[in-house]
Structures are given as structure tokens and as C-alpha cells.
Amino acid sequence: MNGFSTEEDSREGPPAAPAAAPGYGQSCCLIADGERCVRPAGNASFSKRVQKSISQKKLKLDIDKSVRHLYICDFHKNFIQSVRNKRKRKASDDGGDSPEHDADIPEVDLFQLQVNTLRRYKRHYKLQTRPGFNKAQLAETVSRHFRNIPVNEKETLAYFIYMVKSNRSRLDQKSEGSKQLE
């Protein structure tokens, strides 16, 4: 059990899969269109939240009750995420089903940010929310606001290129200003 195999271990067969390693020798736990998925399971799990979103979207995915794990393959993980993002874009105020609309606004996944960062964003822009929002609600509110911020792209890119060419940033300017005061 110290990581080295002994002669006795080799007679007993291969070691059992560690319980903590997700997807080790396991296949996806989902049944798609009545057939069990045979792809290898990744580290994404089929949580209650994912299960709820799938049932709301009326997808033909179900969990196989005979398996003892909840890990899904990368294909189904990406499929579920893409369906979630497509539905969000289609539900936007201006129609959203034109191909131009999808190319104009890149999808930014703010769910990856920490709760403190989302709260700081909310405080900076003085967004009105109820107290006690959880991370998902906060990320949804912030992403709704983030998509509606007007940006002068030409000016922003010109400023960025200028700063890159001059090897300076606003932080450099602030530190130089404090040196001049001394």
C-alpha cells in the first residue's frame, strides 16, 4: 500500500480504482435519447442544479439509475453549457436570433469570478439588488449590466495600442506622479 506493487499484489489482479478519483475507469452516467452514453466520464458532475436546468430546457437527457456515480463526459458537459448559453442569447431583449448578434457580443462567463469580485463590481456600478443574493444571482445581475455597458471600441483600441507602443500604463503614470511630488 506504499505505492509499490509486490509479488502478492500482482497475483491478485489490478488495483481497485481510488474512490476519490472522478472518472477513473467510469463511463458517463447519462442516458441520451434512450441509449446509455459510453464515453469516459470526466470530472464534471451531474448536480441537482444541472439536472433542474436540463428539465427546464426539455432535453432528452436522464441519469442512469444503475450507476453509482454522477460524473458526465466532456461531450455532455459542453453540450449542456452550449444549450444554456444559446438560450440566454435568444432570450435577450432585441430578438437575438440573428447571426450578427451572436458575433457582435461575445459571451463572457462571469460565473468564473469570485463572489467578492462580483460584489465589488456591483458596488462600483451601484447596481440595485436584494440583500443576500447567492453567487448565481449576483453573476446573472452583473452579466446583464456588463452586456449593456456602452463601449467606444475605436477609442479603446487606439488607447490600448498607444499604451502598448509607449510601454506605459495608468499604473506607471500614477507612480511617476507620486515621485514628482517628493
UniProtKB/Swiss-Prot annotation:
Composition skew (Acidic residues), residue ranges: 1-10
Show where the record puts the motif Nuclear localization signal (NLS).
85-90
Zinc finger (Atypical) residue ranges?
A: 28-76
Q: Recorded GO terms, molecular function? A: DNA binding; histone binding; non-sequence-specific DNA binding, bending; nucleosome binding; phosphatidylinositol-3-phosphate binding; phosphatidylinositol-4-phosphate binding; phosphatidylinositol-5-phosphate binding; zinc ion binding
Q: What cystine pairs are annotated?
A: C28-C29, C37-C73
Which parts of this chain are annotated as the region Important for DNA and phosphoinositide binding? Answer: 87-89
Q: Which UniProt keywords apply?
A: Acetylation, Disulfide bond, DNA-binding, Isopeptide bond, Lipid-binding, Metal-binding, Nucleus, Phosphoprotein, Repressor, Transcription, Transcription regulation, Ubl conjugation, Zinc, Zinc-finger
Sequence positions bearing N-acetylmethionine: M1
Q: Which residues carry this modification: Phosphoserine?
A: S92, S98
From the Swiss-Prot or TrEMBL record, state where the protein is found. Answer: Nucleus, Nucleolus
First-listed, main subcellular location of the protein, grouped into a coarse class: nucleus
GO terms for biological process, alphabetical: negative regulation of cell migration; negative regulation of stem cell population maintenance; negative regulation of transcription by RNA polymerase II; negative regulation of transforming growth factor beta receptor signaling pathway; positive regulation of stem cell population maintenance
**What does UniProt give as GO cellular component?**
fibrillar center; histone deacetylase complex; nucleolus; nucleus; Sin3-type complex
Q: Which Pfam families match?
A: SAP30_Sin3_bdg (PF13867), zf-SAP30 (PF13866)
| Positions bearing the Glycyl lysine isopeptide (Lys-Gly) (interchain with G-Cter in SUMO2) cross-link | K48, K154, K165, K174
**Can you state the subunit structure given in the record?**
Interacts with components of the histone deacetylase complex SIN3A, HDAC1 and HDAC2. Binds histones and nucleosomes. Interacts with FEZ1.
Q: What is known of its domains?
A: The zinc-finger domain mediates direct interaction with DNA and phosphoinositol phosphates (phosphoinositol 3-phosphate, phosphoinositol 4-phosphate and phosphoinositol 5-phosphate). In vitro oxydation causes reversible disulfide bond formation between Cys residues in the zinc-finger domain and reversible loss of zinc ion binding.
The family this protein is said to belong to? Belongs to the SAP30 family.
Q: What does this protein do?
A: Functions as a transcription repressor, probably via its interaction with histone deacetylase complexes. Involved in the functional recruitment of the class 1 Sin3-histone deacetylase complex (HDAC) to the nucleolus. Binds DNA, apparently without sequence-specificity, and bends bound double-stranded DNA. Binds phosphoinositol phosphates (phosphoinositol 3-phosphate, phosphoinositol 4-phosphate and phosphoinositol 5-phosphate) via the same basic sequence motif that mediates DNA binding and nuclear import.
Q: Can you say what this protein is called?
A: Histone deacetylase complex subunit SAP30L
